[in-house]
């Protein structure tokens, strides 16, 4: 087998492969012999059909099959011989495949970038530390109460946090527009569900009252036909309901699976959950800084095939998350390219760190992570058992642990500053990092 390789770009390779005619004929004959053993042809007993008849009937098909298999096999042999690491399937262009002659074809493909991760000492990380104070716990209890609020009809004027049942008709330039009308809509004032000015315009309204609201759609409104336009909404208030927060009692505690331990037992469980959330938030923020630092210190070119695969995966994710009748390939690729590029770059860099430092998932950390996740459930022992019986889930946990070990490895070499902050600041979400 003859092989030559041409570098057509930083990552693209054009490999010409020649396969001797003798090897092709050997593969063709092997398939014809297999066919002869089972072929059923009138006038001949099974297995006794002359090879000349078999060849006449089946040679073309056997040759096509042999050529396809040989291209696949010899491509793999060639990349191993040339020590290449393809990052996707090749585009194959046959150059010569006449019967009795050598097969020659060209395979064009991308390879994974070869690089060494460096610049660890240029990475700066701010590592937060915080505690769950009693005041934080009290605030969380209020949040839980508000999440379980009930509304009772009242005859007083509407205030912020009241729930209104309304009918409305919206007009732009004096014309009713699509999606601008509804009946029996429940709206909590101050929730920010409606465009600016709409909810404020209903403060003070009573049941049975009609109000005309003059508002303007935001410039960045999702419907471009309405963005920045003035609108008039005629709103009828059907009912006004005031919020009633539940008492912190046994009935309320049971909603969270906590029984017969009273308010102190409930506070203890909520604190545990807050502490778990705190640990995860701090860990996540450190990880994001480490990943940003690795990207900044190690600019690499990524194979287009990997980028396309990641874009397609994100498209499918988006359809699954948001639903609708749209197909993944109907979503513009540009929407996902930055996120896909970041993910692919990080995947390659993290994999290289694992390789450079010979990292393996730590079994003790795997157990610890499973127990941590299981502790959020009412029957943690069953959750732990489920993980250990599910190899796919175990592999996912191992991957997360290995990524954490990469972060730890980087932290040992990076510049780390510790900072004490409040619980609220520590758990506050940060904006998703953007690709460069």
Curated annotation (Swiss-Prot):
The keyword Cell cycle applies. One of its GO terms (cellular component) is cytoplasm. It is found in: Cytoplasm. Its EC number is 5.2.1.8. GO terms for molecular function: peptidyl-prolyl cis-trans isomerase activity; protein folding chaperone; ribosome binding. SUPFAM superfamilies: FKBP-like, Triger factor/SurA peptide-binding domain-like, Trigger factor ribosome-binding domain. HAMAP family: Trigger_factor_Tig. Consists of 3 domains; the N-terminus binds the ribosome, the middle domain has PPIase activity, while the C-terminus has intrinsic chaperone activity on its own. This is Trigger factor. It comes from Pseudomonas syringae pv. syringae (strain B728a).
